Swiss-Prot record:
GO terms for biological process: neuron fate commitment; regulation of transcription by RNA polymerase II; stem cell differentiation; transcription elongation-coupled chromatin remodeling. Residues 221-237 have a biased composition (Low complexity). The modification Phosphoserine is found at S15, S19. This is Elongin BC and Polycomb repressive complex 2-associated protein. It is found in: Nucleus; Chromosome. The gene is EPOP. One of its GO terms (molecular function) is protein-containing complex binding. It comes from Homo sapiens.
Length: 379
């Protein structure tokens, strides 16, 4: 039972654990701080992802987000000169990471803001950053210019309270997107602060910052004029192409086979409403076209044949073989055929006389006797 039931895990760890990326200050180590490759990769990813997050741009009434600067004893990471270029502006070189150094932290806080200004001072773009500011730790003086540099968003620490924000002029434009502004202003752009009645206009090729909320007057004129002038032109060819496509489909052999060659459209019915052909048919279309039927002349119908008033039908005449006996007038049977004819009357058509051969016996002889050649008359 002891092996099946594992020891219960404590809900709260016995000893507080720090971040997996930060070393625990258990032993005051002397020398260069060591970090794992995974920690370095995570730090680099965070440093590269923070400026990209601000590239989405603030809203019309919002302030641009700034990346925080780790300072003082709150910063668990105090790397030396080994940090990559993307991370140098986040930390300042200090003493031992294990032992908190308040004086070094204050010096780093004071030097964090003007360091970028000194880099910009070399180019002559922003002279107000060249002055060393002795502000209390954790706070940088706000520049007198209402327009702020892009690098100040990444290097300056977050302002502790919004009370310092009203220093911006009421006529100043809202902060623009940091990613859309170049790191250093062009050579021809003046750096004097704008007057109280004018708003600073950044030098941009397409002026996307100006047209963020209200497009320039020239832009709406072009779309307004384009639908009225260009809409009828493409509409007519589209209708013609669609009509031509429908005509080809309805005249195709596959369509005709599917419809059972039912001419369901007025243009396909053969009649006076059919439009005349534009030109002589070519190729297979000429073979499929049926010639026009010749005009039919009104011919008089043949007169009905005159039928006899009395019927000439006789059952004995149509009988296959002449009967031997028939019923007489007295109701008795009598021979059907007789050679005793009265006067010049002819025997009936079914009389065997008409079947006799000339020169043969009047009474047909049996086939056996005829075959033997026996003559009954002679016997």
């Amino acid at each position: 039972m002891e092996t099946l039931c594992p020891a219960p895990r404590l809900a709260v760890p016995a000893s507080p654990r720090g971040s997996p990326c930060s070393p625990t200050p258990r032993k005051p180590c002397r020398g260069t701080q060591e970090f794992s490759p995974l920690c370095l990769r995570a730090l680099a990813f965070c440093a590269l992802a923070k400026p990209r997050a601000s590239s989405l741009g603030p809203g019309p009434g919002e302030l641009a987000a700034r990346s925080p600067v780790l300072r003082g004893p709150q910063a668990p990471l105090r790397p030396g000169g080994w940090a990559p270029d993307g991370l140098k502006h986040l930390w300042a070189p200090t003493g031992r990471p294990g032992v908190p150094n308040t004086a070094a932290g204050e010096d780093a806080d004071v030097a964090a803001c003007p360091r970028r200004g000194e880099e910009e001072e070399g180019g002559g773009g922003f002279p107000h950053f060249g002055v060393r500011s002795c502000a209390p730790p954790g706070r940088c003086p706000a520049p007198p210019h209402p327009r702020e540099s892009t690098t100040s968003f990444a290097s300056a620490p977050p302002r502790p309270a919004p009370g310092l924000e009203p220093q911006r002029g009421p006529a100043a434009s809202p902060p623009q997107e940091p990613s859309s502004r170049p790191p250093s202003p062009p050579a021809g752009l003046s750096t004097e602060p704008a007057g109280p009645g004018t708003a600073p206009r950044p030098f941009l090729p397409g002026q996307p910052a100006e047209v963020d909320g209200n497009p320039p007057p020239a832009a709406p004129e072009a779309p307004a004029a384009s639908p009225s002038t260009a809409s009828p032109a493409p509409a007519a060819p589209g209708d013609l192409r669609q009509e031509h496509f429908d005509r080809l489909i309805r005249r195709s052999k596959l369509w005709c086979y599917a419809k059972g060659f039912a001419l369901d459209t007025p243009s396909l019915r053969r009649g006076p409403e059919r439009p005349p052909a534009k030109g002589p048919a070519r190729g297979a279309a000429k073979k499929r076209r049926l010639p026009a039927p010749p005009p039919r002349t009104a011919q008089p119908r043949r007169p009905a044949p005159t039928l006899p008033t009395t019927s000439t039908f006789s059952l004995l005449n149509c009988f296959p073989c002449p009967p031997a006996l028939v019923v007489g007038e007295d109701g008795d049977l009598k021979p059907a055929s007789s050679l005793r004819l009265q006067g010049d009357s002819k025997p009936p058509p079914a009389h065997p006389l008409w079947r006799w051969q000339m020169g043969g016996p009047a009474v047909p002889e049996p086939p056996g006797l005829k075959f033997w050649g026996i003559n009954m008359d002679e016997s």
